[in-house]
From Swiss-Prot:
GO term, biological process aspect, one: response to cation stress
Family affiliation: Belongs to the cup family.
Keyword Repeat carried by entry: yes
PROSITE patterns: RICIN_B_LECTIN
Domain of life: Eukaryota
Protein name, as recorded: Calcium up-regulated protein C
GO molecular function, one term: carbohydrate binding
Organism: Dictyostelium discoideum
Biological role: May play an important role in stabilizing and/or regulating the cell membrane during Ca(2+) stress or certain stages of development.
Gene3D superfamilies: 2.80.10.50
């Protein structure tokens, strides 16, 4: 069964509109707010997929997709609302096109949602959703309105809506970019390369810092002992801790789940001091700008293309129709009497059309000069809007095509540096969406003011394509591809992304409402996160940053095919002769070398492409964020038990999600160890264990998330042969993955008898749609 959620946990409310659609494949997002106010007679509630009443703040669980035929899908599109077999409670199930109990009618006039299978109405029973005969109670009254989900899952800034006296934006910042827990979160001017200002809002309402895995926004100490005023801190990610869960309401306020009446604001004057304190307090009013925030990028195009279609003004008869057809013929030199059909055509000049329409005069055959003038002004407006919308997308397409124009050559050059055979059938984890998302992240982190325009268009195109793929039940997994097919895979996805942007542009150009809203964004100041104003953008700088980021993404895909990390725990000898291929922290020393030779390191020409371009050594050597190198454990020049390292294999679980995980490794009834895996980090099972005799030895691994939910189970096969390093693999048919997750291709590297290092295996885990 499903529940309703407190309205204080909701996000942006939109203008209420009649819900409708024009295509059987199209699904429009909406939210449903109950007019029932609960026992306190104050708090209304949202229809929610949450399993518990006070669970989360994310808008995704309160956003639904209405299809043309009356199905109500979850925001992911995986499940639909249905009436249970008992005919009372409402539940989420797989789509069954033949089931009428999955069809609903939303009556926005009378605020009712009726089930077509049994004729009953959506109702509330002790915060659970049910259906019941019409009874007139407030529990059966629902206000439905349009909205698009807030940007979750992508990195960006949280900026105050209030600018300083020099029109600079200020944003949430971790003090001094510290990765230590209980560090103050303050306000600083938004700056390039300030990783402490980059955050990610997760689907359950946590706000992750890009500084480190598991580092989240939390409530800090009380201000002068107050129960309603607190500072903000960072802290370690905790399970089911409402103080670490946040939401964004209709007033663009970031509120806390534990204290839903308290919101994030700041005390002080922006621009006077270099750092301003953030507070959690109750705003003096809904419009208090010190408590209002903007996500950067806003992905404003996502919201626009999810709007209810708004057709162009209709001219169906009389002088209005005659004026429209006459002006269409004049504009196009007799080509068509329907000029709107050409707004999406790439082979026409809308600028020439505009001049022709402007110079046209009312012919004697049209009696109403007022009708003619009204149509003429409307067409001029449409052409003005269309010209500017096309210009934005044309500039994006030009940027995007230049980025990938040397794709084949660049991939070949990198393959030669890494010593990869691009004709082989070796499988790599080559997710294109992750690669292009990393490009947009690089742009906004290097150019926070203006770079968000490119990210706005690009990420919106990605989302637009994914929604289209869901509607058409298409889109195979992109997490695994052979080297011989990698370029074709990347090129195909590049073309798909170009097509997605083109399709989104055409969707906007064919809808008066979408075109009007997009045009308005074209003239916002460039520093506005919602802006599409490309005037003054330094495309050369943007292209340089994007090219480096895409090159790095390609290295991330190719590097694990020939290199791995050799880890030596702290206190033991490790032969380091160059910082180019090594990294040391408090846990030990990490050395990058070939997978079959721990003494053969990557060439300087390759490492220069990393370190000279600002790539984090910590992220590379610990397989954090986009990096996924397998890790072998080795003890150099050791005797005794450590001389048998070649008999062992050490699994690494790479967590590509925003939820902390842990995995338990067992051998029969013996527990080898429990290992934590931070968000976007890798966890290495580095515990030394007894390997046994020659032959196959099996180790079971169970992966769960921080809330105790199962993620995946599999068995590692550690095969010992005489005078050889161990062979490691995932035992056939042992992998079980829970819904909502995808396990990528494991990287399996043999150990070495002669060099004394262990086998390594890395298992990447992704969140699926």
């Amino acid at each position: 069964m499903i529940n309703i959620e407190d309205i204080s946990k909701s996000s942006n409310q939109s203008e209420e509109k009649q819900l409708k659609s024009t295509s059987s494949k199209t699904k429009y997002p909406f939210a449903a707010k109950s007019l029932f106010k609960g026992s306190n007679n104050i708090t209304p509630y949202y229809l929610s997929t949450s399993n518990t009443f006070q669970c989360v703040a994310s808008e995704s669980i309160q956003t639904w997709l209405l299809s043309d035929d009356g199905h109500i899908f979850t925001s992911s599109g995986n499940f639909v609302l249905d009436v249970s077999s008992g005919g009372y409670f409402v539940e989420l199930v797989q789509l069954n096109s033949n089931s009428k109990t999955q069809i609903w009618t939303i009556d926005t006039t009378n605020n009712k949602i009726q089930n077509q299978g049994n004729g009953k109405y959506l109702d509330i029973d002790n915060l659970n959703i049910c259906v019941a005969p019409l009874n007139g109670n407030a529990t059966q009254k629902w206000t439905t309105f349009r909205r698009a989900p807030i940007p979750t899952g992508n990195w960006g800034y949280f900026q105050s809506k209030k600018l300083d006296s020099n029109n600079n934006y200020w944003g949430l910042s971790v003090l001094n970019n510290s990765t230590s827990y209980n560090t103050s979160v303050v306000m600083n001017k938004v700056q390039a390369k300030s990783i402490g200002q980059i955050w990610q809002m997760t689907n359950d309402g946590h706000i992750l810092s890009r500084l480190d895995g598991n580092l989240v926004l939390d409530i800090g100490p009380s201000i002068n002992g107050s129960k309603t005023n607190y500072y903000l801190n960072t802290n370690v990610y905790k399970a089911n801790d409402l103080m670490q869960q946040w939401g964004i309401n209709e007033n663009n306020q970031i509120f806390n789940q534990y204290y839903p009446n308290l919101c994030i604001g700041f005390v002080g004057e922006l621009g006077v001091d270099s750092t301003v304190n953030c507070v959690l307090a109750q705003p003096t009013s809904a419009g208090n700008i010190n408590f209002q925030w903007i996500a950067n990028p806003t992905y404003s195009l996502n919201q626009i293309v999810s709007e209810v279609p708004e057709p162009f003004p209709a001219y169906t008869s009389g002088d209005l129709l005659a004026s429209y057809q006459y002006l269409s013929n004049i504009a196009t030199n007799g080509y068509t009497d329907d000029i709107r059909s050409l707004y999406t055509s790439i082979n026409v000049s809308l600028e020439i059309f505009y001049v022709n329409v402007t110079n046209a005069t009312c012919p004697s055959s049209i009696h109403s000069t007022e009708d003619f003038s009204n149509v003429q002004n409307q067409i001029k407006n449409e052409l003005t809007y269309a010209i500017n919308v096309r210009l934005v997308f044309d500039n994006y397409s030009d940027f995007y095509s230049k980025l990938f124009s040397q794709g084949s050559t660049n991939l070949t050059n990198l393959a030669n540096l890494i010593n990869v055979d691009m004709s082989s059938d070796q499988v790599v984890n080559g997710d294109y969406t992750d690669a292009i998302t990393s490009v947009f992240y690089a742009i906004i982190s290097e150019i926070p003011i203006g770079g968000s325009i490119i990210a706005n268009i690009g990420e919106s195109a990605v989302e637009f394509g994914e929604l289209d793929a869901e509607s058409n039940d298409s889109g195979p997994s992109t997490y695994q591809v052979t080297l011989s097919k990698l370029y074709d895979h990347l090129n195909e996805n590049y073309e798909n992304e170009m097509a997605n942007a083109q399709s989104m542009k055409n969707t906007i150009l064919q809808d008066w409402g979408m075109m009007s809203k997009t045009f308005a964004l074209c003239f916002l100041p460039t520093n506005n996160p919602s802006s599409l104003n490309i005037n003054g953008l330094d495309f050369q700088k943007i292209s340089t940053i994007a090219s480096i980021a895409y090159q790095t993404a390609m290295i991330q895909m190719l590097l694990p095919t020939n290199y791995q990390i050799y880890f030596t725990p702290a206190g033991y000898y490790a032969p380091v002769s160059s910082d180019d291929y090594s990294y040391t922290d408090s846990t030990g020393t990490y050395i990058m070398a070939e997978i079959d030779n721990c003494n053969s390191h990557p060439p300087k020409a390759l490492t220069d492409k990393l370190w000279n371009n600002g790539v984090s050594k910590q992220e590379v050597f610990t397989s954090s964020y986009g990096w996924n190198l397998a890790t072998s454990v080795t003890y150099y020049n050791m005797v005794g038990k450590y001389s048998g390292m070649f008999k062992l294999s050490f699994p690494t679980v790479k967590n590509f999600t925003s939820v902390p995980m842990q995995f338990v490794m067992t051998n029969g009834s013996d527990r080898v160890g429990t290992f934590n895996v931070k968000t976007h980090f890798a966890g290495l099972a580095s515990t030394y264990y007894y390997s046994g005799a020659l032959g196959h030895h099996y180790y079971d691994i169970a992966v769960i998330d921080i809330n105790g939910n199962k993620v995946a189970n599999f068995t590692v096969d550690n095969n010992l042969e005489a005078l050889e390093g161990s062979y490691v693999s995932i035992k056939t048919n042992s992998l079980v993955v829970q819904p909502g997750y995808v396990v990528g291709n494991p990287t399996c590297n043999q150990g070495s008898f002669s060099q004394g290092f262990a086998a390594s295996i890395l298992i990447p885990i992704y969140k699926s749609n």
